[in-house]
Every structure is written in structure tokens, then in C-alpha cells.
């Protein structure tokens, strides 16, 4: 979404920190073991991150605990899940998000699915790889909704403040 009007001054409002959603709200209590990183992949990610730290590069995996917030999910998440890894209590190695968790992270909750007639949430009709790609390429619906509301609000105020010459007069 993009809107521009040269004589309207707009800045995004600061986020309401009381509404921050942590990972624990989307995590499954007993995810299938196939989402746990193998010893080989976990060692590879650690070694790769160390190599890049020594070179001064920014590569690293995102190791999250359930009380934190997730990093951005990308379409490449299906490859190794390194952007968003979840610390484990019972297992030594971290795990990736399940497709169901990724769906909820990106805002496609069961309540959202009901708006489209899916009473039990959106069914997964593609492979895990395709699901991760689709979620990683999507935009969070709530983000789009909030941006659109801000644009409508500012434009409505600008129209209300229109001066007699027909030009939009901003009082910002």
C-alpha cells in the first residue's frame, strides 16, 4: 500500500507495546519431531554463523525463546528454518516452526480463516515447503489493515480540512 500527498505530513504512530504478541501464543505444545534440527544441521548452522562472525559479516541464525518475538519470516524458511529457530527444553537442538505455527505467525489465525468460511482454520493443501514459501512471501493481514486504517484516517482529516480553494490544507 502506498499513498502520497505532498502537503500532508504523516508519521506512523509508535507501536503499542502492550499489544506485542510473543511466540508462546502460536507455539504447539508437542510439535512433531521432524521439525527438530538434526545434529548435523545444527552443527552446520553454528559453524556457518561462527565463520561469518569472524569475517565481520552479519549472517546468523535466529534462536528464539517462547517469551520473545520472532524475526521476519522469509520465503527461504523451508531450506533450514535458520531465521526463526525455537529453543527447546527437552531436546538439545532447536526446532523450526511447523507450517501451522508459521501460518499463525503471519496472521492467518483460525479466527481470520472463519472470515473466509473455514470454520476449523485454513487447511494445508500444499507441501510444507510450499506452505513456508507462501507464508514467507505474504504480508501479515493485520499489518495491511492497520496501514490502510492510518491512510484512511489521515485522508479523511485532510478532506475535512480542505480550504475554500479546493486544495487540501493540512493542519499537521
Located regions from the model:
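Flexible, glycine-/basic-rich loop-and-beta segments that form/coincide
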Residues: 1-48, 70, 90
Amino acid at each position: 500500500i502506498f499513498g502520497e500527498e505532498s502537503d500532508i505530513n504523516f508519521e506512523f504512530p509508535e507501536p503499542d507495546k502492550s499489544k506485542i504478541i510473543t511466540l508462546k501464543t502460536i507455539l504447539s505444545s508437542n510439535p512433531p519431531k521432524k521439525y527438530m534440527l538434526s545434529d548435523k544441521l545444527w552443527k552446520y548452522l553454528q559453524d556457518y554463523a561462527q565463520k561469518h562472525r569472524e569475517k565481520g559479516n552479519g549472517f546468523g541464525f535466529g534462536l528464539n525463546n517462547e517469551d520473545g518475538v520472532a524475526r521476519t519470516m522469509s520465503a527461504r524458511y523451508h531450506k533450514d528454518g535458520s531465521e526463526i529457530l525455537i529453543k527447546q527444553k527437552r531436546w538439545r537442538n532447536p526446532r523450526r516452526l511447523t507450517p501451522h505455527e508459521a501460518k499463525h505467525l503471519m496472521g492467518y489465525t483460525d479466527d481470520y480463516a472463519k472470515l473466509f468460511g473455514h470454520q476449523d482454520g485454513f487447511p494445508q493443501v500444499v507441501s510444507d515447503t510450499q506452505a513456508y514459501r507462501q507464508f514467507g512471501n505474504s504480508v501479515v493481514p493485520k499489518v495491511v489493515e492497520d496501514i490502510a486504517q492510518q491512510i484512511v484516517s489521515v485522508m479523511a482529516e485532510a478532506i475535512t480540512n480542505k480550504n475554500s480553494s479546493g486544495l487540501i490544507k493540512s493542519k499537521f
